[in-house]
């Protein structure tokens, strides 16, 4: 963070936010906000390519992080009123900073590039090995928070950096080991945490997909449980409404077919640079991009062989970065002009004949688990008819199933060990683990979670034939002769 001294001002700052109104940033928090590692989040969109379908959804992770700071402060203030003894000031500071910094590890186009990071051994080996099961941005964030420049700011704020990492990752044991009550981990990472409360309402506001959330009712219902946060019965209805609206948002927003195809194309561009699918050679000329904080202020060649490269580009910089590789250059230009891949085939309950619901769910889950292999086989079949096709032109993309777990947090009285289930009780985040029993989740998977096959607009019919033949061969499943092939459209 060259040229940045990190000196805290004497007074707090008041920021205006479209969602929360006034947000107070305390003096010791301002150096973190001003740090280049945090300021770069202005260039990382909160919802990635969603703006190509919902034009106003151009809010950034910078704004979201400030919103989580605000809500974490409100939540910890409520919990402090309930705690005996009350929470000391340093614990409150740690929770607020965890809210502010929880997304600091996000790179260019966030989750789109993370998929490549996980699938590339060279990159995966650079992530924090002490956080198995966590997402790449959390592992990168942990490394950044423990780096020398940010450690100096933590020391200046009298906050333990490792405690903040434990809060962000929801590590109850780690939070306790650093002297904080373990329930505080639920403020940042839990069923009703500040992160979810902000991104749900913020994504709704800026996308135009309506959803009403009563923050005051939820916060007034907070209670301290063991080991995490509970809600009183007064908050039960609000929690169920939140969870229901979240599921609706997944179907309408995050899993929209245009959003998913744009996400695939971004992933394909990064994949082509790092090391494309199916063993093809990486783009030989790399990706040339201007990096604002380069020592000489000149262009640098980024080949995404290091995790740090993902932090050096904004979303817009990636889309406009020149590349010597024809495929990379073409796909970025198509993203800029919204000339996207389209649906060649949609697998959902009404496109599979002569099987019952349980058999369909098993079949769909088998396709989800082997989506990469199915993609490769469809591509190989399609190449027989279209030899010029690139691996990045064909995708098998299952809808993302929202995680609605650990929702049985309703207690009759604060601290009551008896939990009362919501209508989402039994929602199973691991679909391969056991048969789905929650009726809401079951219907979601049957009717609201299609599996898409995307292909170039000029090759939809042949791609549909390739997809159906591969699925019949691999899964021995009878598909109807006529399946949904959309007419080409923007």
Regions found by a protein language model. Name each.
Residues 1-97, 106-490:
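Histidine-centered, transition-metal-coordinating active-site segments
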